[in-house]
Amino acid sequence: MAASNQSEVNIGMVGHVDHGKTSLTRKLTGVWTDTHSEELKRGISIRLGYADCEIKKCETCDEPECYTVGKKCDSCGGKLVTLRKISFVDAPGHETLMATMLSGASLMDGAILVIAASEECPQPQTKEHLMALDALGVENILIVQNKIDLVTEEAAIENYNQIKEFTKGTVAENAPIIPVSAHHGANLDVLLKAIQEFIPTPERDETLTPKLYVARSFDVNKPGSEIKDLKGGVIGGSIIQGALKVGDELEIKPGIKVTEGNKTHWVPIVTKIISLGVGGKKLKSAVPGGLIGVGTELDPNLTKSDALSGSLAGLPGTLPETLEKMVIKPQLLERVVGSQDELVIEPLKTNEVLMLNVGTSTTVGVTASARADKAEIKLKLPVCADKGDRVAISRKIGSRWRLIGYGIIL
């Protein structure tokens, strides 16, 4: 069970650009996740956005009207019981930002695939995001047919049939399809009921050695701060197993790149947890579920501008090795998704450059050897990962990285 104030489950908000992921997140949480200046200017998500909400239920009203995220019942104004606190991970839908979406997928216990009723289905990144969820093992999926306020009933039914056809044979074949207008808040009660039913809180073993996927890192100090007021660097991410508490020593891998002569190696960073927080509230300890901010004693220069994102953190001496080369068992898709021409995917080749996502890290590697059942890849940036972890594999096709499958680390 998550600590009070902590979310129990992470739900990804995925889908094609401009289909309404960020608007739906805002309607459910009250938080507009596009806060980066470039995002506001361009009107699209660029980084992963995070926001929490509590699903509540009125004990006197019938289903689904009894479900809300408000402070009182939308139907009768009565008192509410809190059922569960959840975290949304809002992933970018633009094709150039696929690496960011893939790094977010590793944090997701379930996902909401947002599809606009006002456009033909599937759009390129609708396909690519669904394949990514499949490749990275995210199975609990809901489909939101958004923007139903913009189409006629006939067009909405036709779009629904397109969605059913598109998801046939995929991990989302039996996913509920919920028509919603995020703009008007229509049918959100039905969506909340479906989240409760179809995206359960995973069973967590808090006795395992803790591991935290680092998705963001920051310098929280304002320019011109007095030296006595300076705070250590902050990392943000999700605990995937075990528990961390204030005062614990924390090791972060791969760490810092050190060059001696003409040789380069990576040195893990060891620090101390000064604070744990979620949504502006302090915690004494944190367990899996939701997105956690970890205050440390690190020089903020090491954490600024997401410098440590993609790292793995845990207790000193418990983390897996840092890999500079990786041996994987590849599982490739049949065709390239996300592009207009759905080309047949050829097997991996020796000396091919690939983009790999494992956990929250994104790296590029060159295949040293490639067979159908085994590939060895030399990494440009090392990763800290365990045997058995899933790796998303992307190949450069034209000017874009395209998801071509996944691999299991051997």
Curated annotation (Swiss-Prot):
Residues 6-203 form the tr-type G domain. Its cofactor is Mg(2+). It holds the Pfam family GTP_EFTU. GO terms for biological process: formation of translation preinitiation complex. Residues 15-22 are annotated as: G1. Zn(2+) binds at C58, C61, C73, C76. SUPFAM superfamilies: EF-Tu/eEF-1alpha/eIF2-gamma C-terminal domain, P-loop containing nucleoside triphosphate hydrolases, Translation proteins. Residues 90-93 are annotated as: G3. Residues 146-149 are annotated as: G4. Residues 43-47 are annotated as: G2. This is Translation initiation factor 2 subunit gamma. It comes from Methanococcus maripaludis (strain C5 / ATCC BAA-1333). The gene is eif2g.
